[in-house]
Amino acid sequence: MGESIMEQVEAIIAPVITEQGLELVDVEYVKEGAHWYLRIYIDKEGGVDIDDCTNVSHLVSEVLDKHDPIAQAYMLEVSSPGLERPLKKDEDFERFTGKLVRVLTKEVYQGYKEFTGYLVGLIEDDIVLEYEKERMAIPRAIVDKANLTFEF
């Protein structure tokens, strides 16, 4: 079997986004009610604004129409990843070292499926967090989601 739709979409749109001096953070293709949504999350140092999102929306729409990787109709949304930005790439784990992070696992690990702590980094293939002077290494292979979080 070939590439998934998301892999195709990412391969098509990543160069367009990078050319604008932006980072492709994440892509989601989800059905909500009767409608499909293609959500593209972009970022840059200092954050993105509405003009960045509008510009990327137009550019991405053109390139997706040309390559047409998605058969059915969908709504395109381009936005910032927000305060709870997902951490997916190795670079994310380096860039956000010291930040408060929430990690959800696919299975119970050491009695839990949810972990919150300050990101120490990606060490070998473990996401290492520190909370109340205790370190926890969570195997990346069992991680479902990792994202920045914030304290109230």
From Swiss-Prot:
Source species, domain of life? Bacteria
Q: Which UniProt keywords apply?
A: Cytoplasm, Ribosome biogenesis
Record bears the keyword Transport: no
Give an example GO biological process. Answer: ribosomal small subunit assembly
The main place the protein resides is cytoplasm
Q: Does the keyword Cytoplasm apply?
A: yes
Which cellular components does GO assign to this protein? Answer: cytosol
Q: Where in the cell is it found?
A: Cytoplasm
Alphabetized Pfam families for the sequence? DUF150_C, RimP_N
| InterPro entries the UniProt entry points to | Ribosome_maturation_RimP, RimP_C, RimP_C_sf, RimP_N, RimP_N_sf
What HAMAP family does its record include?
RimP
Known role: Required for maturation of 30S ribosomal subunits.
Q: Which NCBIfam families match?
A: PRK00092.1-2
The family assignment reads: Belongs to the RimP family.
Q: What is this protein called?
A: Ribosome maturation factor RimP
Q: Which organism is it from?
A: Desulfitobacterium hafniense (strain DSM 10664 / DCB-2)
Gene encoding this chain?
Answer: rimP
